Amino acid sequence: DTDGDGYVLIESYSNDGTKTDNEYMESLNAKKIQGYVKKSILFQVTPSSKYALLVDKLRQKMYIFEAGAIIGELDVSTGLNNAKQPYNESPAGEYITVSKVGDFDAGGRTIGRFAIRINGGTLLHEVLHDKAADGTRIYTQYEAQLGMKASHGCIRIQRRANAQGQNMQWLWNNLENKTKVFIWDDQGRQMYEPELPDSSLQLYRNPNGGSNYHVDENCSG
């Protein structure tokens, strides 16, 4: 929206690590800032083309893309809302990463690591852990929640490396600023089992070469 003097109403989120009097809430939700700026000083941001992330709230998975192809997937926990705290839902949409926040205190002795802020204010971070008196990180409670909604709105991401060596620390080390992040909603969607062919289906291969199976014995590929 613009007013009559060529100004545009914008909104942003604090990302400088400054804490409010409510440290716990500030660590989870960046402080929202609104104001008018001159339209002439605005410019379009070009997202990084190296990687992209897709968070599927239905499957509670994060998919890592490179050059348009999926190169890995990670278990996540997105926001769990309820009647009293509907704002805990992780908002679906299209975002970019805007800053690396690092480790943060999520209340008491609970810590989140490698936090990256997206422009919607949400944090992507390693699954939480409780810090024992001797400094040991205890992930048991929060790792058990991966694959289901559990957070206050942030995206918790697995710490154990997948087969490709990817985890939250890998994202921290490899993602450039302004990486595209897509969050798919789960409302109105259903998860289906993969469609498997009937056991009686006859499959053929081309005897002259080719690696694909076909249902037609006169296949050509």
Predicted features along the sequence, with ranges:
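Acidic glycine-/aspartate-rich tracts in secreted/extracellular proteins
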Residues: 3, 15-16, 69, 102, ...
